[in-house]
Amino acid sequence: MNVILLDKIANLGSLGDQVSVKSGYARNFLFPQGKAVPATKSNVDLFEQRRAEYEAKLADQLAAAQARAEKVNALDAVTIASKAGDEGKLFGSIGTRDIADAVTAAGVEVKKSEVLMPHGTLREVGEFDIELHLHADVFANITLKVVPAE
């Protein structure tokens, strides 16, 4: 199925690209999320008329994400206190939601879907570098300190 992308999508393309994707991916993900429209003649014409509007919207989102990244990078280490045993093992774990809540409490709004944890949840006390994916082109890093709760 041929679609016109309305947003930049990793490993697929950017705004205005006409790409061929599987119909299930288009129907179940791209269309409901508003990231693409079918590449019919009328949609192609409509897209060309509204291209400047879409590009301006994308530029605004990028600028907002870059501003948030600067705020995140300006933060000192974010600290999370959690119950831990004598050897530094946590009772439970710290996941994306906990990190997003801690960064939001520190002053920068972050969603849990923006926190990247490729090695899984944190299960021990220590200092960790966490990467935040704020936009398709914008990444930020924070230092997370996990300390035992008193």
UniProtKB/Swiss-Prot annotation:
- Identify the keywords attached in UniProt to this record, alphabetized: Ribonucleoprotein, Ribosomal protein, RNA-binding, rRNA-binding
Swiss-Prot/TrEMBL GO biological process terms: translation
Cysteine pairings via disulfide bonds: none
Q: Which residues form the signal peptide?
A: none
* Any GO CC annotation of this UniProt entry: ribonucleoprotein complex
Keyword Transport in annotation: no
- GO MF term set: rRNA binding; structural constituent of ribosome
Q: Which PROSITE patterns match?
A: RIBOSOMAL_L9
Q: Where are the transmembrane segments?
A: none
- Which HAMAP family does the entry link to? Ribosomal_bL9
Q: What does this protein do?
A: Binds to the 23S rRNA.
Q: What's the family?
A: Belongs to the bacterial ribosomal protein bL9 family.
* PANTHER family recorded: 50S RIBOSOMAL PROTEIN L9
Write down what this protein is called.
Answer: Large ribosomal subunit protein bL9
Which organism does this sequence originate in?
Answer: Idiomarina loihiensis (strain ATCC BAA-735 / DSM 15497 / L2-TR)
Q: What is the lineage of its organism?
A: Bacteria, Pseudomonadati, Pseudomonadota, Gammaproteobacteria, Alteromonadales
Annotated gene: rplI
